Amino acid sequence: IPYFTEHTSMEGLYFDSSITTPFHFISVSGLAKRPSNPVGGLSYINNQFDQGVEHLNHLGVDYFISYTEEIESKAMDSEKLILLFSSEPFSVFKVNSSKVELIYQDIKVFSKARTQDGILSSILRDTDINNFFDKAYESFDELDKKRVIEVSNGMNIVSSKKNDLQITDLNITNNKISFFTNSPGELHLIKVSYFPNWKITNGKGPFRTSPSFMSVIPDNK
């Protein structure tokens, strides 16, 4: 699909290295007729189609493709999916999602353990050390209500009170994300997997944000 559409897909050659992968499989479990559920230890949502669609929105997915009559029927009944076209046995739906949003939810600040403590925790199997993934996983079903955000140096992070975000000229590549916003100074969620090598120009962040994304505070438009 990426080859012919020039559009990325949720699964790819290196996607197992992404911190979004567990959340992808949880979402798929609600959308597929016979989900593979390959990652152990996760609470899957088998056959809970509406919840799966909600997760697509949270993950910033643009399109959903069905290829069985049963799943196509569920997709047609969903108010959050828009049929674009069908070409048997496939039907392509638009997902009502966005790549950049303001964070309006309650914020739960996560304080990262010291590097040496994290290493010792891994070696000794010490489960008392806080882990960002655990906190993000626990709140995956509550993304409309709260976000877990990792900050350092005691920085004060607050939710946005605005509801009229306008994003223009959004451009996402493998090594650069750029956009214009009408809400400088507000906390923006970027639905791209967090990685510590990302750096920001004209703003603060990026901050690791649940479930597995980044957030930034632009200094200007």
Q: Can you annotate each of these PLM segments?
A:
Residues 28-88, 186-193:
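Periplasmic/luminal catalytic loop of GT-C fold multi-pass membrane glycosyltransferases
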Residues 92-94, 217:
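Short, well-ordered beta-strand micro-motif
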Residues 13-14, 87-88, 96, 210:
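Residues at the C-termini of beta-strands that transition into short coil/loop
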Residues 82-91, 100-101, 107:
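Structured beta-strand-rich cores of soluble
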Residues 97-105, 188, 221:
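Short, charged/polar, Gly/Pro-enriched secondary-structure boundary elements
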